[in-house]
UniProtKB/Swiss-Prot annotation:
The keyword 4Fe-4S does not apply. The gene is nuoH. This is NADH-quinone oxidoreductase subunit H. The lineage of its organism: Bacteria, Pseudomonadati, Pseudomonadota, Gammaproteobacteria, Candidatus Pseudothioglobaceae. It comes from the Bacteria. It is found in: Cell inner membrane.
C-alpha cells in the first residue's frame, strides 16, 4: 500500500498543470485499469482451468493443443469469438439486443471496487460496501431478462422468465444469510466484517453460521446460473435460453459476466465466512510465525481458488435439477431456515456466546 501511495503522490507531482479534480480522475482511471485487466485475465484462464479440471474428473485430458499444455487456449477462444459475425434475429429490437450484454457485464465489474483484497488493498472503502455489492450485483440479471425479451424468440424468453423468478427467490435468501454475518460483525462494511474475524480460524464466521454458509454457497451457484442449477440456459430443455440468439462478442460478453460473477461470489464467501485476508494460523504457536511472511492477499486468493474449485467439482458431480425443484428449495427450505437462524443469531448475540458474539 505504501508503494501505491507513493505512485499517487507521483501522479500529483508530475501533473502540476492539472487541477486536483483532473488528477483525481486520472487516479480513478488507473485504478479501474488495474482492476479490469487482471479480472479479465483471471476469467479467461478460469475457463481453461474449468475444462482441465472437469476433464481430469471425467478421465479426459482437456485442452492441450494450443500452446504448451494448452495454456494459449483462452487466447484462441477469444480470437475466435472476436472474429465471428454478430447475427441479429429478424424481429429483434437491435438496440436493446446490444444493450443486454453491456447491462450484464457492467455490474459484474463495478462491484469489485469495494472488495477488500488485504487490509489496505482496495479501490474504495465504502461504509455500506455490502449493500453496494447486493444492490449493484442484482442489476446484472436485468441484462439477462432484457436479452430474452429483445431477442423476440421463445427460448430466450423462457430463460428470461426463469431468471426473473430465480432473482426474486434467491436474492431474499442471500440477503437473509448475509444478514446473520452483519449481526455478528455489527457493520455492513466488508473491511470491518473481515477485521471482526481476526485471531485465527476459530473466529471465522463459518463456524457459528455453518448452515448460512452452505445456503449462501448453493444460492450463489443458482444466482450465477451454474450447474446443476443452470435452468436459465438449460441446453436439454430450452437449448441455451437467453444465449440462443447471441453470437460473436455479444455472446462472449455474457460469458465473461457469468464467470466474473462466479469469482465474485467465491470472494464474497471468503470475506463473509472465511476470514478474508486473515491467515488460518493466527494465534497458533509456531505456525503463526512460520507463515507470517505470507501476504494477506495470498491467503484471500488461496481461499477463493478453493471455492472456485468447488464450483467445478459440483458441476462435474451432480445432474441438473428441475426448475420447480429449485424454486421449492428456495421458498420451502432455504427461506424458513434463514429466518429461523436470524433469530438464533440474535439470541446468541444477546447471550454473548464466546468467542464469536
Amino acid at each position: 500500500m505504501e508503494l501505491w501511495q507513493a505512485f499517487v503522490q507521483m501522479v500529483y507531482t508530475l501533473t502540476p498543470w492539472f487541477d486536483g479534480t483532473i488528477a483525481s480522475i486520472l487516479i480513478i482511471l488507473i485504478k479501474a485499469i488495474t482492476l479490469v485487466i487482471p479480472l479479465m485475465l483471471v476469467v479467461a484462464y478460469f475457463t481453461y482451468a474449468e475444462r482441465k479440471v472437469i476433464g481430469y474428473m471425467q478421465l479426459r485430458i482437456g485442452p492441450n493443443r494450443v500452446g504448451p499444455k494448452g495454456w494459449l487456449q483462452p487466447i484462441a477462444d477469444a480470437l475466435k469469438l472476436m472474429t465471428k459475425e454478430i447475427i441479429f434475429p429478424t424481429k429483434a429490437n437491435i438496440y436493446l439486443f446490444l444493450l443486454a450484454p453491456v447491462l450484464a457485464i457492467a455490474p459484474a465489474i463495478a462491484v469489485w471496487v469495494v472488495i477488500p483484497f488485504d487490509e489496505d488493498i482496495y479501490i474504495t472503502n465504502l461504509d455500506i460496501s455490502l449493500l453496494y455489492v447486493l444492490a449493484i450485483g442484482s442489476i446484472g440479471v436485468y441484462g439477462i431478462i432484457l436479452a430474452g425479451w429483445a431477442s423476440n424468440s421463445k427460448y430466450p424468453l423462457l430463460g428470461a422468465l426463469r431468471s426473473a423468478s430465480l432473482l426474486v427467490s434467491y436474492e431474499i435468501v442471500i440477503g437473509f444469510a448475509l444478514a446473520t454475518v452483519v449481526m455478528i460483525a455489527g457493520s455492513v462494511n466488508l473491511n470491518t466484517i473481515v477485521q471482526a474475524q481476526q485471531g485465527g480460524i476459530i473466529y471465522w464466521n463459518f463456524i457459528p453460521l455453518f448452515p448460512m454458509m452452505i445456503i449462501f454457497f448453493i444460492s450463489a451457484l443458482i444466482e450465477t446460473n451454474r450447474a446443476p442449477f443452470d435452468v436459465v440456459e438449460g441446453e436439454s430443455e430450452i437449448v441455451g435460453g437467453t444465449h440462443v440468439e447471441y453470437s460473436g462478442m455479444t455472446f462472449a460478453v455474457f460469458f465473461l459476466a457469468e464467470y466474473a460473477n462466479m469469482i465474485l461470489m467465491a470472494v464474497l464467501a471468503v470475506v463473509m465466512f472465511f476470514g478474508g485476508w486473515h491467515s488460518p494460523f493466527e494465534a497458533i504457536p509456531y505456525l503463526e510465525s512460520a507463515f507470517s511472511w505470507v501476504p494477506g492477499i495470498i491467503w484471500l486468493l488461496a481461499k477463493t481458488t478453493f471455492f472456485m474449485f468447488l464450483y467445478l467439482w459440483v458441476r462435474a458431480t451432480f445432474p441438473r435439477f428441475r426448475y420447480d425443484q429449485i424454486m421449492r428449495l428456495s421458498w420451502k427450505v432455504f427461506l424458513p431456515i434463514t429466518i429461523i437462524w436470524i433469530f438464533v443469531v440474535a439470541l446468541m448475540t444477546q447471550l454473548k456466546l464466546e468467542p464469536w458474539f
